[in-house]
């Protein structure tokens, strides 16, 4: 049995580093290369920052990949954050179908500003609470030919929080996902398109149902020798009796880098970014980007003046075997900023 284990220790500077709210953005492990080495088994994000607070702290993350291509992931921080989960992707029916699944439990002290742009922009609204989450997701994806894939998707999401009067939500989701993928490389593409649409219907068996639609568009093109222009757009739209714990959010380690994921949330969230990636010398490269986002909902219609700006830059180190290390610093509105260490490109 081959064991791949990473233990990363990180120290934090108060108030200056990115705080990532959703643990699925802290670690995302995916085996996409046939070469077997230590770092090639790690595909995802690890932030050099407190996960949920601006206090000094330290933490560790690990990933264990079994021969059956099932990945066990974990993350622990001194502020009390804990995550444990599994990820898997298995071809079936002679490779015509693949079964993708994810399950994890996470506990974290985190912050909440309220719903909507106005509440998120008011620093005085910040409140603290403890969040527990258990998530199950599964998809059965069929290869339809000509780079097109589609299939059904199901999920179950359970969230409980203490503080702010406490409460609990749970929802069973079912729907479908379809995507078109012509990228030359999933980890760090230089050409191609990735277009994805997902529709999910949710019920908690005790209240009115709610619904979610997600649209994603990525394009990559080599503009000159060693230079790649990458474009990313994501739209998330929810409607019905949506609990606040399942509203779309802005921020994280992939999009709107530099914003606390969850500070801005509402029924609808859109974000876009344009990134220029340039090979500099030998194993060294760099990237710069500009980004923007907006949130709106039932009581607050879309307003262009409420757009959130973002920008940043970073260093790239390409290791033997094709693994790419990413060091990014992003900043946004009102001095929000953060540093992110990632494995492979953000998108």
Provide a role label for each language-model segment.
Residues 25, 174-281, 289, 296:
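C-terminal outer-membrane beta-barrel translocator/porin domains of Gram-negative envelope proteins
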Residues 58-64, 86-90, 136-142, 154, ...:
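Residues on the lipid-exposed face of transmembrane beta-strands in outer-membrane beta-barrel proteins
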Residues 48-52, 62, 72-76, 88, ...:
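Transmembrane beta-barrel strands of outer-membrane/channel proteins
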Residues 1-32:
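Cleavable N-terminal export/targeting peptides
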Residues 22, 38-42, 51, 100-223, ...:
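Transmembrane beta-strand segments of outer-membrane beta-barrel domains in Gram-negative
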Residues 35, 47-51, 73-75, 123-129, ...:
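Outer-membrane beta-barrel domain signature
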Residues 75, 83-143, 231-253, 259-265, ...:
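Outer-membrane beta-barrel translocator/channel fold
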Residues 21-102, 168-190, 266-270, 278-285, ...:
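Outer-membrane beta-barrel initiation region
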